[in-house]
UniProtKB/Swiss-Prot annotation:
Places the protein is found: Cell membrane
GO terms, molecular function: melanocyte-stimulating hormone receptor activity
Principal localisation: membrane
Stretches assigned to coiled coil: none
Superkingdom, taxonomy of origin: Eukaryota
Protein name: Melanocyte-stimulating hormone receptor
Topological domain ranges for the Cytoplasmic compartment: 64-72, 141-163, 212-240, 301-344
Highest classification ranks of the organism: Eukaryota, Metazoa, Chordata, Craniata, Vertebrata
Pfam families membership: 7tm_1
Alphabetic keyword roster: Cell membrane, G-protein coupled receptor, Glycoprotein, Lipoprotein, Membrane, Palmitate, Receptor, Transducer, Transmembrane, Transmembrane helix
Classification via PROSITE patterns: G_PROTEIN_RECEP_F1_1, G_PROTEIN_RECEP_F1_2
Length: 344
């Protein structure tokens, strides 16, 4: 774990700029030109991480509690919440350890600190890769539910989903170990960037195709009932707005981090790039914000999951409240959200 400050996190050796002393200011680069540098207070960073941690724990607990949510789609959502939980948790852990080291509260050998740094970096990198993979898996699952609706339950069986989940976790951990070990190779960073772009393109293509199918379906209903065309236009605009928000949040939260990695490869010594490198912690904060937003988009829009979540929260205050139901929530219509082209 580097000692230059909380900015050096995942692939920490990529960013050795000192932490800014002001929340928002203009720092001078080597030529004296102004350089915008935003500092994220450690308290804010830890608070956002805590919100993400609690939010995703609730999602995992709700899905684990309700047997009606033990479908392939909710398994992917649960794993997305778990990977987001690890993203926020690992970043919080590293920030807390750095603060303890800088304060002199935690004293240990340099070799132990470096080993701990490498372990946390692997955990952070693997959880980030898993988060991206499960976002793609959710898009694929919903695409199949729309275009292969009659065969959906025979294609996306629970054992197949479990094998896909296991493959994602194992591949992410192994890849992260290699990425952290060979972080100073340009090919490694380019692989990460290409992977992000592939996930972005995959999600965009699938969701746009699903939106087009939904618009065609709505148009068919309108023609069947001889309704006016403006209603169809309104549906298309709402769907396009939802899709724009979905992909826009994904790109805005993850894009800056992978832009940072791209610039490290192509212009590591350029003055403008160095100014961008100074905001590395901002990019990590955006990823933490994405882990907060993901449950709102993919989990909490499900009515049954919200009901189960309420039960989980009530039972945390009044133990034994679910004893009559055997500890499992049973709500009718649990598969309604499996058919929507966009997040439930």
């Amino acid at each position: 774990m580097p000692m230059q400050g909380a900015q050096r996190k995942l692939l920490g050796s990529l960013n050795s700029t000192p932490t800014a002393t002001s929340n928002l200011g203009l720092a001078a680069n080597h030529t004296g030109a102004p350089c915008l540098e935003v500092s994220i207070p450690d308290g804010l960073f830890l608070s956002l991480g805590l919100v993400s941690l609690v939010e995703n724990v609730l999602v995992v607990a709700a899905i684990a509690k309700n047997r009606n949510l033990h479908s392939s789609m909710y398994c992917f959502i649960c794993c997305l919440a778990l990977s987001d939980l690890l993203v926020s948790g690992s970043n919080m852990l590293e920030t807390a350890i750095i603060l303890l080291l800088e304060a002199g509260t935690l004293a240990t050998r340099a070799s132990v600190v470096q080993q701990l740094h490498n372990t946390i970096d692997v955990l952070t990198c693997s959880s980030m890769l898993c988060s991206l993979c499960f976002l793609g898996a959710i898009a694929v699952d919903r695409y199949i539910s729309i275009f292969y609706a009659l065969r959906y339950h025979s294609i996306m069986t629970l054992p197949r989903a479990q094998r896909a989940i296991a493959a994602i976790w194992v591949t992410s951990v192994l890849s992260s170990t290699l990425f952290i070990t060979y972080y100073d190779h340009a090919a490694v960073l380019l692989c990460l960037v290409v992977f992000f772009l592939a996930m972005l393109v995959l999600m965009a293509v699938l969701y746009v195709h699903m939106l087009a199918r939904a618009c065609q379906h709505a148009q068919g209903i309108i023609r069947l009932h001889n309704r006016q065309l403006p209603a169809h236009k309104g549906f298309g605009l709402r769907g396009a707005a939802t899709l724009t928000i979905l992909l826009g949040i994904f790109f805005l939260c993850w894009g800056p981090f992978f832009l940072h990695l791209t610039l490290v490869v192509f212009c590591p010594q350029h003055l403008t790039c160095n100014c961008i490198f100074k905001n590395f912690k901002v990019f990590l904060t955006l990823i933490i914000c994405n882990t907060i937003i993901d449950p709102l988009i993919y989990a909490f829009r499900s009515q049954e999951l919200r009901r189960t979540l309420k039960e989980v929260l009530l039972c945390s205050w009044w133990p034994g409240c679910g004893a009559e139901g055997g500890g499992d929530s049973v709500w009718p219509g649990s598969c309604v959200t499996l058919r929507g082209p966009l997040p439930p």
